[in-house]
Swiss-Prot record:
Residues where heme b b562 binds: H83, H182
Protein name, entry field: Cytochrome b
Organism per entry: Dasyurus albopunctatus
Record note on quaternary structure: The cytochrome bc1 complex contains 11 subunits: 3 respiratory subunits (MT-CYB, CYC1 and UQCRFS1), 2 core proteins (UQCRC1 and UQCRC2) and 6 low-molecular weight proteins (UQCRH/QCR6, UQCRB/QCR7, UQCRQ/QCR8, UQCR10/QCR9, UQCR11/QCR10 and a cleavage product of UQCRFS1). This cytochrome bc1 complex then forms a dimer.
Any one GO cellular component localisation term in the record: mitochondrial inner membrane
Signal peptide: none
Topology within the bilayer: Multi-pass membrane protein
Length: 381
């Protein structure tokens, strides 16, 4: 008798995706982040659902409803800390996942990559609207500054910004709709993640060497289920350490003050995971130029497959490209640091140089390195 998991219409899908899936035998821990992102999403949806049961999306009560959750709801403090720090873990895994894709040439699976970039944008949108909900000072002013960027769009900008706000400024209507967006978007992310996996399973996983692994595949279960389980344990350990020992480490002290439209905080800045893009936005002294640079800093990921010039897929055997990749990583860390600093010298010039280097590396230096490595590998006799 054939095993039920191979015949049942529903179990068959799960079987082909997580049990009898042929996987390359040499994929490293860098391939763990996809499943870790799935776990992060589930944690965020569950903690978010329970928080939504007690939260009120009204300007008068939003801030105190969050305080009420932390003080009066059973384990409400834990739910809130897990949800807030879960977002940080989510982005940590996202950045490592994207970095892995760039390093090992996974972006050559174009459909999977493009859906992944759409997923990244959707998660960023979700995190942004979610940060507004506690209605603290940084929530309010962050929402004001970022939504106000829409007004830089020629002709329709102001109308568009007021349409998003539901009035002439960030107010009750804005908070209510942001809560609605924040509730619906994770389910859209879940659907997109399924499509992401669907496209991935059309081709199978890439591997560190970048060489076609068809000749050496192993079943996903038990080999990679146990490996993923180890990843889950480490992720949960890190999340619990963060949420239980220093829950406010990555937050902004200004958000402990209720939103006040009459009092602007001295330094408006987003959460740490947006600082690199915020630094690029601020490095251009023109409003529209800054908005375009901000968009380009993320959308540039879509053209990375077109900029692949090397004969080899992975960077594993390409030392020049490797060096440029790690310079890019250091550059992004520099941008993250600059995004959190006040707008004054020397931070302005460092931010401008780092922003310029970011685009130069991706658009010019890395494709040139690929061509040079091709030339170096050609037999000279």
């Amino acid at each position: 008798m054939i095993n039920m998991r191979k015949t049942h219409p529903l179990l068959k899908i799960i079987n082909h995706s997580f049990i009898d899936l042929p996987a390359p035998s040499n994929i490293s821990a860098w391939w763990n982040f996809g499943s870790l992102l799935g776990v992060c999403l589930i944690i965020q949806i569950l903690t978010g659902l329970f928080l939504a049961m007690h939260y009120t999306s009204d300007t008068l009560t939003a801030f105190s409803s969050v305080a009420h959750i932390c003080r009066d709801v059973n384990h409400g403090w834990l739910l809130r800390n897990l949800h807030a720090n879960g977002a940080s873990m989510f982005f940590m895994c996202l950045f490592l996942h994207v970095g892995r894709g760039i390093y090992y040439g996974s972006y050559l699976y174009k459909e999977t990559w493009n859906i992944g970039v759409i997923l990244l944008l959707t998660v960023m949108a979700t995190a942004f609207v979610g940060y507004v909900l506690p209605w603290g000072q940084m929530s309010f002013w962050g929402a004001t500054v970022i939504t106000n960027l829409l007004s830089a769009i020629p002709y329709i900008g102001t109308t568009l910004a007021e349409w998003i706000w539901g009035g002439f400024a960030v107010d009750k209507a804005t908070l209510t709709r942001f809560f609605a967006f924040h509730f619906i978007l994770p389910f859209i992310i879940m659907a997109l993640a399924i499509v992401h996996l669907l496209f991935l399973h059309e081709t199978g996983s890439n591997n560190p060497s970048g060489i076609n692994p068809d000749s050496d595949k192993i079943p996903f279960h038990p080999y990679y289920t146990i490996k993923d389980a180890l990843g889950f344990m480490l992720l949960l350990l890190m999340l619990l350490l963060l949420a239980l020992f220093s829950p406010d480490l990555l937050g902004d002290p200004d958000n402990f003050s209720p939103a006040n439209p009459l009092n602007t905080p001295p330094h408006i800045k987003p959460e740490w995971y947006f600082l690199f893009a915020y630094a690029i936005l601020r490095s251009i002294p023109n409003k529209l130029g800054g908005v375009l640079a901000l968009l380009a800093s993320i959308l540039i990921l879509l053209i990375i497959p077109l900029l692949h010039t090397a004969n080899q897929r992975s960077m594993m055997f390409r030392p020049i490209s490797q060096t440029l990749f790690w310079i890019l990583t250091a550059n992004l860390i520099t941008l993250t640091w600059i995004g959190g600093q006040p707008v004054e010298q020397p931070f302005i010039i460092i931010g401008q140089l780092a922003s310029m280097l970011y685009f130069t590396l991706i658009l010019i230096l890395m494709p040139l390195a690929g061509l040079f490595e091709n030339y170096m590998l050609k037999p000279k006799w």
